[in-house]
Structure formats: structure tokens, C-alpha cells
Amino acid sequence: MSEQQYDTLTGLLRAKKNVILQGAPGVGKTFAAKRLAYSMMGVKDAERVMMVQFHQSYSYEDFIEGYRPSADGFELSKGAFYSFCKEAADDNERDYFFIIDEINRGNLSKIFGELFMLIENDKRGEKNKLQLLYSRERFYVPSNVYLIGLMNTADRSLALLDYALRRRFAFFTLSPGFSSSGFTRYREAVNSPAFNSLVSCVARLNTEIASDESLGEGFMIGHSYFCGFVGGTVDHASLSAIIEYELIPMLGEYWFDDQEKVRLWSEALRRSIQ
């Protein structure tokens, strides 16, 4: 992420309080979210960052509060976001960051409930308390809580976000960073002709994916698939594993109705590291 992009993103988050980082697989959404939180804090304080992952079974009871089985029957238990907000309210001079991975996998209306209104930037604070569903407690979202949602744009099985929720978030798209100054320095440190050749091939593949009417830029392959190497550790086996077990299966899903295209690009990827 460039310095200009970072400044834009921090400005959005400060103003809106709620941001969704969206992008193709492997563009570094999780890394960017945590880095954004720590940089806005000015210190790496993991105690002020919480991350949850939404899924189809995730509910209001997990997020806010609900009754859970206990030895004596059922008892009211507090959810992750409720507990996080209470902690932030007791420390209102410092910023807190709540990260939601796969935010578009959950039933958002069901999960957020009455908090749809409370997460808005101008509905924060004690003066906007609302009564919770089960406990009848009057609850508010503190102004020092920032929400960062992460959304994979290449998952075709997911519905579009609820418009009511979409209005309450700013959306920031992360793209593959192969041409960024940071990744260029990383390539120089890796110092591998085969690695460079594979990255160049993937860049051409991304051009093909972006121009495909059934796919588009949201399906491009991110740079994170190729991170983690240090100088001298790149070998044919590790690059081949990325191709065979990560990239080619993905292409099989993308072009399930065009196996010839999958075959041609699979061969191109394999040739790139020969």
C-alpha cells in the first residue's frame, strides 16, 4: 500500500468509523487491517485489537448477547462485540479496533440487530443508547471503537452486502501489489530468476482475468501467495507447490467451463519456473 493510499484509508476510517477492505484473494487484507490498526494507535498493542470471522452460523448471540446452555438451564452470555465495546468504554482515551474477517459470509441483519444504527459515526456515545434484545440493557458503541470488515471479492457464492449496512461503511479496494515499491524491494531481496519469472507470468495472468467479463479485477491473484521467502530460500519445489496446489486449483474454479484455458495457463505457469 502506498503512502497516499494509507493516508486516504486512515482518513476514511477516522471520518466514517467503519471501513470494509475488499479485494481479490491474497492482496493482504488481514495484514493491512492489523497494520492500519497498529499505525493509528502509534503502538503495537494487541490487547486493543479483536478479530472475529463471520460465517453462516454466526449470530446476534455470538456478537452481542444471548442465552447459552448451562448447568442450571440457560444463562445470558455476552458476545464478542459487546465485551469489546465495554472494554473500550472504560478506556475512552485510546482507540480500539474490531476486525471482522469474511464480513459478507454472515447474515448481517441478524448479527448486527439494533446495532445497525449504533455503529454509525454520528450515533456513537452514551446519548444514543438503545435497549438490547435480551437483557434490556441500554447499550451504546463508544466513539473510540473502529470497525474494519474484510471482504473477498472473488467468492461467487456470497450475496451482495445489505444496503443498510453498506451505507454505514466506507469501502476501500486493495489490489495486487506486484508493482509496488515494497514488493519490488522484496523481489530484489529474494534474488531468484525463477521467482521473478513466475511473478511476471502471474502479472500477465491477472491481465487476462481482469479482462474476462465473467471475472474481472476482483478475481485477480494477490501478491501474498508469494510472500514469506527470504534470500536463498526459494527453490523449484516451493514455487512448484504454489503453482500446483494454490494457483491451478483456483484457475479451475474461475474457468470451470473452459478447461482449455485452464490447461494453457497451467502450462504457462509451470514453464515460468523451468
Language-model regions: role of each:
Residues 1-274:
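C-terminal regulatory/interaction module of P-loop NTP-utilizing enzymes
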